[in-house]
């Protein structure tokens, strides 16, 4: 069967996978969206799943400073051995992830960390909007599912499109690094700092400053 560009784009939005991977997944599954999602998940996690159960207690705390010192990121990435922690490929991965966080501002590492009450509130908003369209309940639920996946893709680090290569997600980049290095790797936590965030900026009185400087 013929796979349309719309199908490919919808699958890409739902999974964050590359265009060619999405097209192949749809071709392999006869154009079935849900089966194609499962296909991509199995394919994307294949290399990582064999190592996912191994303890990753070594690693690095990486940092990235941007925009003249006004934005900073710390990220902890774990691996299995100190040897890999010193590996250039691993260190580059940590640096890339820190840079991505600075640019994309995720709120969580993975979807399991999202507060259920936050997710439920989003679903209610999506449901209310979808019902206004007058579509059947089964279609409404599919719309909600797609919007929830987009919501995760916006706020969860692993599901975001990787800033240096938007055709793949951070999860895909992580899986590729695991496959290359041969050890389990896990992004544990991160913090992003914006200079002055949360502080009330004092509005200066320019005329008063000039008068004071002139000794008035």
Curated annotation (Swiss-Prot):
One of its GO terms (cellular component) is cytoplasm. It is found in: Cytoplasm. Residues 81-84 are annotated as: Involved in Mg(2+) ion dislocation from EF-Tu. The keyword Transit peptide does not apply. InterPro entries: EF-Ts_dimer_sf, Transl_elong_EFTs/EF1B, Transl_elong_EFTs/EF1B_dimer, Transl_elong_Ts_CS, UBA-like_sf. Keywords: Cytoplasm, Elongation factor, Protein biosynthesis. Associates with the EF-Tu.GDP complex and induces the exchange of GDP to GTP. It remains bound to the aminoacyl-tRNA.EF-Tu.GTP complex up to the GTP hydrolysis stage on the ribosome. This is Elongation factor Ts. It comes from Geotalea daltonii (strain DSM 22248 / JCM 15807 / FRC-32) (Geobacter daltonii). The lineage of its organism: Bacteria, Pseudomonadati, Thermodesulfobacteriota, Desulfuromonadia, Geobacterales.
């Amino acid at each position: 069967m013929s796979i349309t560009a719309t199908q490919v784009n919808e699958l890409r939005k739902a999974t964050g996978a590359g265009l060619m991977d999405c097209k192949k997944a749809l071709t392999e599954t006869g154009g079935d969206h849900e089966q194609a999602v499962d296909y991509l998940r199995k394919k994307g996690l294949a290399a990582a799943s064999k190592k996912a159960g191994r303890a990753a207690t070594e690693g690095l705390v990486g940092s990235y400073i941007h925009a003249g010192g006004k934005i900073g990121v710390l990220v902890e990435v774990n691996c299995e051995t100190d040897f890999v922690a010193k590996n250039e490929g691993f260190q580059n991965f940590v640096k890339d992830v820190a840079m991505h966080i600075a640019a994309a501002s995720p709120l969580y590492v993975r979807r399991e960390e999202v507060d259920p009450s936050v997710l439920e509130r989003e679903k209610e908003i999506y449901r209310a909007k979808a019902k206004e369209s007058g579509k059947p309940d089964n279609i409404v639920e599919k719309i909600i599912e797609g919007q929830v996946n987009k919501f995760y893709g916006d706020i969860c680090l692993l599901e975001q499109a990787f800033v240096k290569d938007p055709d793949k997600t951070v999860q895909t980049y992580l899986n590729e690094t695991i496959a290359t290095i041969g050890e389990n790797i896990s992004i544990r936590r991160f913090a992003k700092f914006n200079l002055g965030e949360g502080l009330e900026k004092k509005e200066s009185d320019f005329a008063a400053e000039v008068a004071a400087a002139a000794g008035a």
